[in-house]
């Protein structure tokens, strides 16, 4: 950085501190990842200067010929990746992508069926503290108490009972494959629209490692970070029949000018997602998750649903004498970043929780493989077994730093 240290040393120091934290801590938050240098360059470009309300060829400002090209490239790439009929790449976030879909098909007070946040859903799938729960009448499906997986017969019965106008599938903490075809059948049976929020699994879907929702859903929303390894932002895929309505819902419905520097970074990430290397990377994310899950279970931890099919796992800590909140804090003190997370039927409040959520995308980006995952699982076990012992946490922190040195975030090939 050439100018920032002199212009704003406080912000410069905060950024350098975050760089150090990312480089010398183990990032296991399932929704976080490290973008490529190319994505960073695009997002830090002069495109941040340009206002471009509207869409390519139909802007409300002049001088948009180059940002038009950027947005067209981003739209075409994401359509190609997922085989979609229409794409909108302007949503600033996954939440705004979801809001746009709701604005297209729902009126305030309409019935909607979504996944219970406490069972792995998302705030924007009807939580009462979120706009979705305030504007619409959400009913919730969850997981089976015994299998801790979605019971599609129960979803079907609930849908027939509440007759939702929209069914939402997708999750923020569900470690198993979601059967989008079954959800689509349920939606068709009750005459509902069907939307999938694939934010967490977008990279896996792009690589063909999780069934795609695109053939089955009227609308598919996603973030561009997480497994897709792009900048923080969102996008919407839909059938052509909804294209005009979706575009109007995003602009002028809920947003003004698009963030063209972020859309450029999205385009770069989409190009990266079209490579054979990206598919191998996604395969490794899953292999790493399975290796870590197996090692944690070998060490005596109970995982929700007994394992994982994707990039994340939920660890139930109820029999370990430690809450999710305490575990998150202890691990952070040892240089390992996870997040406290509710488990299904959790007796603890959401600010405390009985579990932690662990994901492997960021460590996989660093080049770590199965052996490192098993080692990290043992480090987690060492901390959680001695979570009040500062000497143990300091020892593990040094081991974490040594491991991180072997796998720098921005190697030459990144």
Swiss-Prot record:
<feature type="binding site">
    <location>
        <position position="117"/>
    </location>
    <ligand>
        <name>(6S)-5,6,7,8-tetrahydrofolate</name>
    </ligand>
</feature>
<comment type="pathway">
    <text>One-carbon metabolism; tetrahydrofolate interconversion.</text>
</comment>
<dbReference type="GO" id="GO:0005829">
    <property type="term" value="C:cytosol"/>
</dbReference>
<comment type="pathway">
    <text>Amino-acid biosynthesis; glycine biosynthesis; glycine from L-serine: step 1/1.</text>
</comment>
<keyword id="KW-0963">Cytoplasm</keyword>
<dbReference type="InterPro" id="IPR049943">
    <property type="entry name" value="Ser_HO-MeTrfase-like"/>
</dbReference>
<dbReference type="InterPro" id="IPR015424">
    <property type="entry name" value="PyrdxlP-dep_Trfase"/>
</dbReference>
<dbReference type="Pfam" id="PF00464">
    <property type="entry name" value="SHMT"/>
</dbReference>
<keyword id="KW-0808">Transferase</keyword>
<keyword id="KW-0028">Amino-acid biosynthesis</keyword>
<dbReference type="InterPro" id="IPR015421">
    <property type="entry name" value="PyrdxlP-dep_Trfase_major"/>
</dbReference>
<feature type="modified residue" description="N6-(pyridoxal phosphate)lysine">
    <location>
        <position position="226"/>
    </location>
</feature>
<dbReference type="GO" id="GO:0019264">
    <property type="term" value="P:glycine biosynthetic process from serine"/>
</dbReference>
<dbReference type="InterPro" id="IPR039429">
    <property type="entry name" value="SHMT-like_dom"/>
</dbReference>
<comment type="subunit">
    <text>Homodimer.</text>
</comment>
<dbReference type="GO" id="GO:0035999">
    <property type="term" value="P:tetrahydrofolate interconversion"/>
</dbReference>
<comment type="function">
    <text>Catalyzes the reversible interconversion of serine and glycine with tetrahydrofolate (THF) serving as the one-carbon carrier. This reaction serves as the major source of one-carbon groups required for the biosynthesis of purines, thymidylate, methionine, and other important biomolecules. Also exhibits THF-independent aldolase activity toward beta-hydroxyamino acids, producing glycine and aldehydes, via a retro-aldol mechanism.</text>
</comment>
<dbReference type="GO" id="GO:0030170">
    <property type="term" value="F:pyridoxal phosphate binding"/>
</dbReference>
<dbReference type="InterPro" id="IPR015422">
    <property type="entry name" value="PyrdxlP-dep_Trfase_small"/>
</dbReference>
<dbReference type="InterPro" id="IPR001085">
    <property type="entry name" value="Ser_HO-MeTrfase"/>
</dbReference>
<keyword id="KW-0554">One-carbon metabolism</keyword>
<protein>
    <recommendedName>
        <fullName>Serine hydroxymethyltransferase</fullName>
        <ecNumber>2.1.2.1</ecNumber>
    </recommendedName>
</protein>
<dbReference type="InterPro" id="IPR019798">
    <property type="entry name" value="Ser_HO-MeTrfase_PLP_BS"/>
</dbReference>
<comment type="similarity">
    <text>Belongs to the SHMT family.</text>
</comment>
<feature type="binding site">
    <location>
        <begin position="121"/>
        <end position="123"/>
    </location>
    <ligand>
        <name>(6S)-5,6,7,8-tetrahydrofolate</name>
    </ligand>
</feature>
<keyword id="KW-0663">Pyridoxal phosphate</keyword>
<dbReference type="GO" id="GO:0004372">
    <property type="term" value="F:glycine hydroxymethyltransferase activity"/>
</dbReference>
<feature type="site" description="Plays an important role in substrate specificity">
    <location>
        <position position="225"/>
    </location>
</feature>
């Amino acid at each position: 950085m050439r100018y920032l240290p002199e212009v704003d040393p406080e912000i410069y120091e905060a950024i350098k501190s975050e760089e150090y934290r990312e480089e010398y801590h183990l990032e296991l938050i399932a929704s976080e990842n490290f973008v490529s240098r190319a994505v960073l360059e695009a997002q830090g470009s002069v495109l941040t200067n340009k206002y471009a309300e509207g869409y390519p060829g139909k802007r409300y400002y002049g001088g948009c010929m180059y940002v038009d090209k950027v947005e067209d490239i981003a739209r075409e790439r994401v359509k190609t990746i997922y085989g979609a009929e229409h794409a909108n790449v302007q949503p600033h976030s996954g939440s705004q992508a979801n809001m746009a879909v709701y604005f297209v098909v729902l009126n305030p007070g309409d019935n909607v069926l979504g996944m219970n946040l406490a069972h792995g859903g998302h705030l924007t799938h009807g939580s009462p503290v979120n706009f979705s729960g305030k504007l619409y009448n959400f009913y919730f499906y969850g997981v089976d108490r015994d299998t801790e997986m979605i019971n599609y017969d129960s979803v079907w019965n609930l849908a027939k009972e509440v007759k939702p106008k929209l069914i939402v599938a997708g999750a923020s903490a569900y470690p198993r494959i979601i059967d989008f075809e079954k959800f689509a059948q349920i939606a068709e049976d009750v005459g509902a629209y069907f939307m999938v929020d694939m934010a967490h699994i977008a990279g896996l879907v792009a690589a063909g490692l999780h069934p795609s929702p695109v053939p089955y859903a009227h609308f598919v929303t996603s973030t561009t970070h997480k497994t897709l390894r792009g900048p923080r932002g969102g996008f919407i895929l839909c059938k052509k029949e909804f294209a005009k309505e979706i575009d109007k819902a995003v602009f002028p419905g809920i947003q003004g000018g698009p963030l063209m520097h972020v859309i450029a970074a999205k385009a770069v990430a989409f190009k990266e997602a079209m490579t054979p290397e990206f598919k191998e990377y996604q395969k490794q994310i899953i292999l790493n998750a399975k290796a870590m899950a197996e090692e944690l279970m070998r060490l005596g931890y109970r995982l929700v649903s007994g394992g994982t099919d994707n990039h994340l796992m939920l660890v139930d800590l109820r029999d370990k004498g430690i809450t999710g909140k305490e575990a998150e804090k202890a691990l952070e003190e040892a240089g390992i970043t996870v997040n406290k997370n509710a488990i299904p039927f959790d007796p603890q409040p959401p600010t405390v929780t009985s579990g932690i959520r662990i994901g492997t995308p960021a460590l996989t980006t660093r080049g770590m493989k199965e052996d490192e995952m098993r080692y990290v699982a043992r480090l987690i076990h060492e901390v959680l077994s001695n979570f009040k012992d500062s000497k143990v946490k300091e020892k593990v922190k040094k081991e974490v730093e040594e491991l991180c040195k072997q796998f720098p975030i921005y190697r030459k090939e990144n």
